[in-house]
Amino acid sequence: MDRRQLIAGTAALALLGSRAVAQDVVASGIRPDFLPVEVPIQPGIAPGEIHVVPDTFMLYWTLPGARAIRYMVGIGRPGLYEAGEFYVGAKKEWPSWTPTPEMIERDPEAYAQYADGMPGGPDNPLGARALYLFEPGRGDTFLRIHGTNAPGTIGTAVSNGCARLVNDQAVDLYNRVPLQARVVLYPQTV
């Protein structure tokens, strides 16, 4: 499967929903187009994988029968997004967070105060759940697919390289994805 196949599969997307869902969205403050939705994808894409298409801020959890659940995500800022093939090497609930040395170097005012780490909780930037991306031979890449304490950043390129979801969607994805699941982060083209 390549990026073109996945994008071609998304061309036929149809939002599924109801009036009740739309009313819930208004009450929760989440835009209707940011809700997870089951969508058709190209046949032949294996179930049980995560595919992130950065140009559209979409993450797909693939299902049997050429279907996927589509989530809206925030992605890495220009120059910090890393395309590639990974696997889920760890999963954590309410993960602790420590900025990398590179993050502290880029923005010491924002990150130096957390050099010793921050415990998990509602103020933590990793949110309610995190999937840790690993590469064979490299181990932990420090890339994550995680929740966020800043839901307004979904649909934008603002992170330090990770893909982020609103917390309830991060919990939903976390509960579906097993360890060792394949993750594909496609290259940015725009």
Model features per residue range: what roles?
Residues 91, 146-148, 188:
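Generic beta-structure capping elements
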Residues 4-23:
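N-terminal export signals
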Residues 143-154:
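Short, conserved helix/loop micro-motifs enriched in His/Cys and acidic residues
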Residues 153-161:
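Short, basic/aromatic beta-hairpin or loop at an interaction surface
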Residues 3-4, 164:
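Short, cationic motifs built from Arg/Lys/His that form the positively charged side of catalytic pockets
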Residues 163, 167-190:
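N-terminal targeting pre-sequences for secretion and organelle import
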Residues 28-143:
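Gly/Pro-biased beta-strand-loop elements
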Residues 81-83, 160, 178-180:
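Short edge beta-strand segments in beta-sheet-rich domains
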